[in-house]
A protein has these predicted regions:
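Short, amphipathic, aromatic/basic-enriched membrane-interface segments that mark the entry/exit
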Residues: 23, 42-47, 127, 155-160
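Membrane-interfacial helix-loop-helix
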Residues: 1-35, 60-142, 146-153, 178-193, ...
Length: 215
């Protein structure tokens, strides 16, 4: 429950949560950023973690001196790349067993199908593009590994996608962090980013439940 409470506090009051990490020292601050980004992208059981909003919020704090922007980007790149690589390997070695177990409730047949279709449509480029879609960015590496994509091809697009995604959201927070409106309405902006990430999930769950009722 400790980790769940940790995430709940981050979502409830991101400004206070991140400020407390920074106050605890660089190891805690950068470590928390790395941990959340790595787990969201690397562990298929946690696709709901707030990766986009955390990167934006961290960039905001970097603008105000809480993080060193170069160090923050390096941490974000490392977490995103290593996370996807871990997810790929989990899918490669344990993918079918995990799906068959039914223990990953977020991995509904609809989401698996959507991720597979995304891979079929875009091929290797799906690894890059999938970074910008919540849930898909967690499931695509897993399914790519399970489906036998060559490791070398995956690595290339993983690195490109990880660097691009983490840089875009971090720098958005960094460059917009000095705007008075952003400073005054920081929490609302974070809630908005989280909402955009969660809405597709809620819609998917509703559709799945309605589908079961109609069967």
């Amino acid at each position: 429950m400790g980790f769940i409470n940790f995430i709940a506090e981050l979502l409830k009051d991101p400004r206070t949560a991140i400020a407390s990490w920074i106050a605890a020292g660089p190891l805690m601050a950068y470590g928390c950023v790395f941990l959340i980004i790595f787990i969201e992208t690397g562990v298929v059981f946690f696709p709901f973690l707030p990766g986009d909003s955390l990167l934006f919020a961290s960039g905001f704090f970097a603008h105000n001196g809480g993080f060193n922007i170069v160090a923050l980007l390096a941490v974000a790149w490392s977490a995103a790349i290593l996370g996807d690589q871990c997810n790929f390997m989990i899918g490669h070695f344990f993918g079918r067993k995990i799906i068959a177990s039914g223990k990953v409730k977020a991995m509904t047949p609809e989401r698996i199908k959507k991720s597979e279709d995304f891979l079929d449509k875009w091929g290797h480029l799906a690894i890059f593009l999938g970074r910008f879609f919540p849930f898909i960015r967690t499931f695509v590496p897993f399914i790519a590994g399970m489906g036998g994509m060559h490791w070398r091809n995956f690595v290339i697009f993983n690195v490109l996608g990880g660097i691009t995604w983490s840089t875009v959201f971090t720098l958005l927070g960094y460059f917009f962090g000095g705007i008075p409106f952003v400073q005054e309405h920081f929490e609302l902006l974070i809630i908005g980013i989280v909402a955009v990430s969660i809405i597709p999930t809620v819609v998917g769950l509703v559709k799945a439940k309605l589908g079961k009722k109609n069967v």
